[in-house]
Design a protein with these regions (language model features):
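Short hydrophobic beta-strand element within catalytic cores of glycosyltransferases
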Residues: 318-322
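Conserved donor-binding/catalytic core segment of Leloir-type glycosyltransferases
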Residues: 145, 190, 194, 198-200, ...
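Nucleotide-activated donor-binding/catalytic signature segment of Leloir-type glycosyltransferases, i.e.
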Residues: 263-287
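A charged, aromatic-enriched C-terminal amphipathic alpha-helix characteristic of glycosyltransferases
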Residues: 182, 186, 356-389
């Protein structure tokens, strides 16, 4: 734990949603799990339409550094209080670690003390990577950290060589042995006479789905057949709407299967008997959900951290991911723990194979469990993080 060995301040904004930058948290300092979190108000809302128009213009026309800085300002977040805090206090920090290359707080914050700055750029294949602004930021900073090996080709293709570069990766909490006593710890998980009855009176209950892995989740949500799980925000630009369309095509020939959606709902969900909304779940229930699933679905093309996919692998559930997500594909290839798709037809074929081939699922699931145990340890990821920051302190 970094907090046990270092004094850590987290500087962030009061706005949880980058699509609006609306302030929803109180400004000021708070302790969260032993970490001092300082929140600063965002002064300008995000104008999505104006930002989209500027992005399109800069992509197709010659532009200046001033145009790039205006693009950064419009992307946001505009948090002048955060930048003023850095200007006053940066000498009290051994290192300043910034996450996401292109946001205004990173561009303005690294300019305060580049000699103390480490950047985790969170690189995605976007036309804006060609902006000259990023090269100057990387060249003046003291280190670059990467979450995924998929970022490295982009870093080397578009940005200058950094003095210190580290593939830090990510960690996943170890999957503890989840037990399912006759009387669950949570009263809602207790066995009742109704637990042995299907939600649809005409749907037969398969005892295979009421024993073993994921029992509490299946009982609570009355899930008695093949189950695919999506964990993440349900929004218009992260692949979840496409997932709903693809699963609808799959369910036309596989009516027994259910898709469970686990996360914040920000788009309308179609009225479909094959789709269930579980909402936002705490860690323990989330792990029960991954164990209950036959397959976890990862449709986002932009999720470099791929946390839902990795949590699924950690408990031994194989995944089916979008081929557009280089980080997810990299994990699945290295782990040999799932499949990926590039079209609706490939999605339907791959999900059909995974749902109907028990031995394949078991083999992929065990591969994923071993991969998480060997390569997704938090102590190893934090050790690499400290090594990167330590180099900055010594330079």
């Amino acid at each position: 734990d970094l907090v046990e060995r270092h004094d850590v301040d987290v500087l962030t904004t009061c706005a949880p949603d980058s699509r609006t930058w609306k302030n929803e948290y109180a400004e000021g300092s708070d302790k969260i799990r032993g970490v001092n979190v300082r929140r600063f108000a965002v002064k300008e809302p995000h104008d999505h339409d104006a930002f989209t128009r500027l992005t399109s213009r800069l992509r197709s026309e010659p532009h200046t550094r001033a145009d790039e800085l205006e693009w950064v300002r419009m992307l946001g977040p505009s948090a002048p209080g955060l930048i003023e805090h850095l200007k006053r206090q940066h000498k009290h920090y051994d290192a300043l670690v910034f996450f996401s290359l292109q946001h205004a707080t990173t561009v303005q914050g690294t300019a305060v003390a580049p000699e103390r700055s480490v950047i985790f750029p969170y690189l995605l294949p976007r036309p804006s990577l060609r902006f000259g602004l990023w090269s100057d930021m990387i060249a003046s900073s003291r280190g670059v950290g990467l979450f995924s090996a998929a970022e490295r080709p982009l870093l080397h293709a578009f940005l200058p060589e950094s003095g210190h570069e580290e593939l830090v990766g990510v960690g996943i909490e170890p999957a503890t042995q989840l037990t399912y006593p006759r009387h669950q710890q949570d009263p809602n998980d207790a066995v009742t006479p109704d637990d042995d009855l299907p939600s649809d009176a005409e749907a037969p209950v398969s005892e295979d789905y009421l024993s073993g892995r994921g029992v509490p989740f299946r009982r609570r949500h009355r899930l008695y057949g093949p189950l695919a799980l999506y964990g993440g925000r349900l929004e218009s630009d992260n692949g979840s709407e496409e997932l709903l369309e693809y699963f609808d095509a799959y369910s036309q020939t596989n009516p027994d299967a259910t898709l469970v959606l686990m996360g914040v709902k920000m788009v309308s969900i179609p009225d479909n008997p094959h789709i269930r909304l579980a909402g936002v779940l705490p860690y323990r229930d989330r792990m029960f959900a991954y164990e209950a699933a036959d397959v976890t679905l990862a449709p986002s093309s932009d999720d470099l951290l791929a946390q839902p996919l990795l949590e699924s692998l950690a408990v031994g559930t194989p995944a089916l991911a979008s081929a557009r997500n280089a980080a997810a594909v990299e994990h699945l290839r290295r782990a040999e723990a799932g499949l990926y798709y590039g079209s609706k037809e490939e999605f339907v074929d791959a999900l059909t194979l995974l749902m109907t081939n028990t031995k394949l699922r078991e083999r992929l699931g065990e591969n994923g469990r071993q991969y998480a145990r060997l390569h997704l340890r938090w102590d190893a990821a934090l050790g690499r993080f400290e090594r990167l920051v330590g180099r900055v302190k010594r330079s």
